[in-house]
């Protein structure tokens, strides 16, 4: 009898072990369908496209770019950028490649973003957002079917170069001139998003502009000192950002029921500003200067062979790696916020929710302006994640 009981216990133990070891491990991205990630915009999302459009030696292809990953990879960071982390969370098993480079695996998406990209004008050795969308259309038939495109995520960050160039060329622009320019930029953004939607895309992630006046390169060029931002550029960014949510609400509201327009808006402006103003909460010890560069804010010349730029000892203590772009540590934070944060950060849903939301159903929620209560909540937090 005892032998039978021992055998039974042994069988149960074996069964328990097999059950435990065969149970799927819970990881970020579990239950996320096999969809793609497509990125559009400027150097913040450029995965290596810029080097295909110029014969000039580019700083992001030289050390110390890629320092945290041991090798420059054409990205404007010491390592990975936010879309790289987002792709991991979406369980995409390959790195999202630069679409303009030959012989790359675009089976799960591609980056069409190019450094120096704008919405308006004709950027030198770069592409406007409209040109990036048209490039996607050229590649679509040979690489992605309609169902894959409809269920994939299309992520856009664009406009910073438009406002930086405008401010340099129009230093004395009055309020009405500024407002007219913001309207021109956002109208063009709406048209380009509509073009992408007409190409079959249905799930959009729009990242608001950063507080451009707080970028180290802007502080340095406009001599703001170490503790001040250039508020004229911040005001332009805020005017731009205020138009994004209502614009996307309208696109979703007017889309036919047979082809829903789904979106979310990532509040990148406040994600940066919060880390600038309460840097200790996020273990950033320098937020007003760059890890790599020269000048009053170490904001110029990182990666240029003919510039003897300074390199910080520990890049993870910095919010910015160069004069305009964030460190890998910050990029990973933004990836987490994009994928899983609440509506104080990204609304009306995060990307995890957007991906699993049925592609054939209209959105039940819309973007709403942040309230004073939301602002007070942000300001009252201690060691917060946002």
UniProtKB/Swiss-Prot annotation:
Kindly list any coiled-coil regions of this protein.
none
Pfam families assigned to the protein according to its UniProt record, in alphabetical order: Lipase_GDSL
Q: InterPro entries annotated for this entry?
A: GDSL, GLIP1-5/GLL25, SGNH_hydro_sf, SGNH_plant_lipase-like
Q: Which GO terms describe its molecular function?
A: hydrolase activity, acting on ester bonds
Location of the protein in the cell: Endoplasmic reticulum
Disulphide bond pairs: none
This entry carries the following GO cellular component terms, namely: endoplasmic reticulum; nucleus; plant-type vacuole; plasmodesma; vacuole
Active site at which residues? 43 (nucleophile), 322, 325
So which tissues is this one expressed in?
A: Expressed mainly in roots.
Q: How does it assemble?
A: Part of the PYK10 complex. Interacts with MVP1.
Q: What is this protein called?
A: Inactive GDSL esterase/lipase-like protein 23
The source organism is Arabidopsis thaliana (Mouse-ear cress)
Q: Which gene encodes it?
A: GLL23
């Amino acid at each position: 009898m005892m032998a039978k009981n021992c055998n039974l216990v042994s069988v149960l133990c074996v069964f328990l072990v097999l059950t435990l070891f065969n149970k799927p491990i819970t990881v970020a991205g579990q239950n996320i369908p096999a969809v793609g990630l497509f990125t559009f915009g400027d150097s913040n999302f450029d995965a290596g496209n810029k080097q295909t459009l110029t014969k000039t030696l580019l700083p992001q292809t030289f050390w110390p770019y890629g320092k945290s990953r041991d090798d420059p990879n054409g990205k404007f960071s010491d390592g990975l950028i936010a879309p790289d982390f987002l792709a991991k969370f979406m369980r995409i098993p390959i790195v999202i490649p630069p679409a303009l480079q030959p012989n790359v695996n675009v089976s799960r998406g591609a980056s069409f973003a190019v450094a120096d990209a704008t919405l308006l004008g004709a950027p030198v050795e770069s592409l406007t957002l409209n040109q990036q969308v048209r490039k996607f259309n050229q590649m679509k038939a040979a690489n992605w079917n309609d169902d894959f495109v409809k269920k994939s995520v299309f992520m856009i960050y664009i406009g910073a170069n438009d406002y930086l160039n405008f401010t340099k060329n129009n230093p004395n622009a009055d309020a009405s001139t500024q407002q007219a320019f913001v309207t021109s930029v956002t109208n063009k953004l709406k048209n380009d998003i509509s073009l992408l939607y007409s190409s079959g895309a249905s799930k959009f992630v729009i990242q608001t502009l950063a507080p451009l006046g707080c970028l180290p390169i802007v502080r340095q060029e406009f001599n703001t000192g170490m503790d001040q931002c250039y508020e004229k550029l911040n005001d332009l960014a805020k005017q731009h950002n205020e138009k994004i949510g209502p614009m996307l609400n309208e696109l979703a509201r007017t889309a036919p029921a047979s082809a829903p327009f789904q979106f979310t808006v990532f509040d990148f402006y406040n994600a940066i500003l919060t880390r600038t103003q309460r840097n200790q909460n996020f273990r950033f010890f320098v937020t007003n200067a760059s890890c790599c560069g020269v000048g009053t804010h170490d904001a110029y010349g990182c990666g240029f062979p003919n510039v003897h730029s300074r390199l910080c000892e520990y890049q993870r203590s910095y919010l910015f790696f160069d004069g305009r772009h964030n460190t890998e540590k910050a990029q990973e934070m933004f990836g987490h916020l994009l994928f899983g944060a609440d509506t104080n950060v990204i609304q009306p849903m995060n990307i995890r929710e957007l991906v699993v939301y049925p592609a054939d159903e209209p959105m039940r929620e819309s973007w709403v302006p942040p309230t004073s209560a939301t602002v007070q909540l942000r300001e009252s937090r201690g060691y917060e994640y946002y």
